[in-house]
Swiss-Prot record:
Protein name as it appears in the record: NAD(P)H-quinone oxidoreductase subunit N
GO molecular function annotation: oxidoreductase activity, acting on NAD(P)H, quinone or similar compound as acceptor; quinone binding
Domain of life: Bacteria
Membrane topology designation: Peripheral membrane protein
Top-level enzyme category: translocase
EC number in record: 7.1.1.-
Family note: Belongs to the complex I NdhN subunit family.
Gene Ontology CC: plasma membrane-derived thylakoid membrane
Length: 158
């Protein structure tokens, strides 16, 4: 790996494919450098984890209900004993509305992507076609050096 990496290849491939699967060294640090380069190139980044996402399509693009952890407490009403359902706005729409005027778009960077199912990965592969301002980067696993490929190719390999 080069001593100083500009990140131009990653940015070029992200704009070309729309969704990338990355393999990062397990000691970490490299993904932060590439996120910084994406921000310097005019993108806004949203860093989330794949664990606990639930229905990925609903979480990202639709109003969805969540229940807070009940911590052993029961509600006194006649509803479910696990608590009230709170409805949250779609996370992508909320962030796209807040983009600066000169921003190139939103990069959704998902860590721990190895736990996502093939259907979820297929949806995330097609997400940049549904919303052109959104690009997707998913950490698919570890490697000795930081490398990336189109998310569609990582889907075929799994």
């Amino acid at each position: 790996m080069a001593l100083i990496t500009t990140g131009n290849g990653l940015i070029r491939d992200l704009e070309k494919f729309g969704a990338l699967g990355v393999y990062v060294p397990l000691e970490g640090g490299y993904e932060g450098r590439y996120q910084r380069r994406l921000r310097a190139a005019g993108y806004t980044t949203l860093h989330i984890t794949a664990k606990g996402l639930g229905d990925v399509a609903a979480y990202l693009t639709r109003i969805h209900g969540v229940r807070p952890p009940h911590l052993g407490k029961k509600s006194t009403g006649s509803g479910a004993a696990v608590g009230q359902v709170y409805y949250l706005p779609p996370i992508l729409d909320s962030h796209l509305e807040q983009l600066p005027p000169k921003s190139k778009g939103l990069v959704l960077w998902i860590i721990e992507g190895h736990i996502l199912s093939n259907e979820e990965l297929e949806y995330l592969t097609n997400l940049p076609q549904l919303e052109p301002r959104v690009k997707v980067v998913i950490e698919r696993g570890g490697d000795r050096a930081f490398r990336w490929t189109s998310l569609e190719k990582t889907l075929l390999a799994s």
